């Protein structure tokens, strides 16, 4: 339930551009391909085609994370809202257009405002005005920034009881463990004393279930993975996409899926003025997705200054939504 705010949509939307470094795909790819284990930066998956492909992935029967997390929120969002409490400021790391964000905002008790943080200004502006139209009684602040870096965020004009961040989608699993702990530590500083974080995590489970989710029978994930090579070709590379295949094994010891592009033949590729040789069967790593035991994630959160106070899971314990609160002791 949200209190009425008589200001117009335009008056309730604030756009703050921190001018994030958008990166140089060619330079970052060149650096990654020079390493002993060749890799490419996963942030370049998401051009317009990549975003559409990922949306299609979330609808696949094998891909359980999205629908499982949404099911948890459908069942428990009012308990989540009670844990957050009334008159909170919600900070979402993302553009805020998803169903999960709307479900949470619908359940929150008179939130003072929502702060969206995303690197794409165009996506932010569009979603900020959509949210302001939907919630005609709440201030929306859109911050164009890289949320993986240290930030100081603007606050809504109305006083807030606490600040709570929202990070759904098991996106935290794309970080290495040290990176995840560093990110959680920055979030703890961002939300401050009394603050919290509602975060989705993908749980450890049967290896076949995990691998099927990232190696779907229709080949949509393969197209998504190969799209990064197409993007590089737009920037002066010469990858032949037909000479690569997608594979995403689960690495048991590391507890993560590893997205790979495997060279089908011995070949040489060019990125800008740099050339790289690949042996037949050699792979390029494009993304990691860590799966957690709940106790493991609790230890990581504690290392970052949080304590796990509540969590909600599906009946099979495939996925959990965790509520962390800043440990003020």
Tell where the protein language model's regions lie, with residue ranges.
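Substrate-binding/catalytic lobe of Class I Rossmann-like enzymes that use SAM or dcSAM, i.e.
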Residues: 209-294, 298-304
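Conserved beta-strand signature within the Rossmann-like core of class I S-adenosyl-L-methionine
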Residues: 190-204
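Conserved class I S-adenosyl-L-methionine
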Residues: 87-96
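Conserved SAM-binding loop of SAM-dependent methyltransferases across substrates and taxa
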Residues: 97-110
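A short glycine-rich, Lys/Arg-flanked "PGG" loop and its adjoining helix->strand segment in the class I
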Residues: 181-193
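Conserved SAM/SAH-binding beta-strand->alpha-helix loop
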Residues: 117-122
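N-terminal auxiliary segments of SAM/dcSAM-dependent transferases
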Residues: 1-44, 51
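Class I SAM-dependent methyltransferase Rossmann-like catalytic core
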Residues: 37-84
């Amino acid at each position: 339930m949200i209190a009425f705010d008589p200001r117009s949509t335009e008056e309730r939307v604030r756009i703050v551009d921190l001018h994030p470094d958008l990166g140089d795909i060619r330079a970052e790819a060149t650096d990654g391909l020079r390493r002993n284990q060749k890799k490419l930066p996963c942030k370049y998956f998401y051009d317009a085609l990549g975003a559409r492909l990922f949306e299609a992935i979330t609808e696949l029967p094998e891909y359980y994370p999205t629908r499982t997390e949404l099911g948890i929120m459908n069942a428990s969002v009012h308990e989540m809202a009670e844990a957050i409490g009334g008159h909170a400021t919600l900070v979402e790391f993302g553009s805020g257009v998803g169903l999960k964000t709307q479900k949470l905002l619908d359940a929150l008790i008179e939130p003072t405002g929502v702060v969206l943080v995303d690197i794409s200004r165009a996506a932010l502006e569009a979603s900020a005005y959509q949210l302001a139209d939907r919630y005609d009684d709440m201030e929306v602040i859109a911050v164009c920034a890289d949320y993986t870096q240290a930030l100081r965020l603007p606050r809504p004009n109305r006083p807030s009881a606490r600040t709570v961040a929202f990070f759904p989608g098991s996106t935290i699993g794309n970080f290495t463990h040290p990176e995840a702990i560093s990110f959680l530590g920055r979030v703890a500083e961002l939300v401050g004393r009394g603050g919290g974080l509602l975060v989705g995590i993908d749980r450890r489970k049967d290896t076949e279930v995990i691998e099927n989710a990232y190696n779907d029978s229709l080949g949509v994930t393969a197209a998504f993975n190969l799209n990064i090579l197409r993007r590089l070709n737009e920037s002066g590379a010469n990858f032949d996409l037909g000479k690569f295949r997608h594979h995403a094994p689960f690495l048991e010891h590391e507890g993560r899926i590893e997205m790979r592009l495997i060279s089908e033949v011995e070949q040489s590729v060019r990125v800008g003025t740099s050339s790289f040789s690949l042996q037949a069967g050699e792979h390029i790593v494009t993304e990691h997705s860590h799966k957690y035991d709940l106790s493991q994630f609790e230890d990581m959160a504690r290392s970052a200054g949080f304590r796990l106070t509540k969590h909600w899971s599906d009946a099979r314990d495939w996925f959990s939504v965790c509520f962390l609160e800043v440990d003020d002791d």
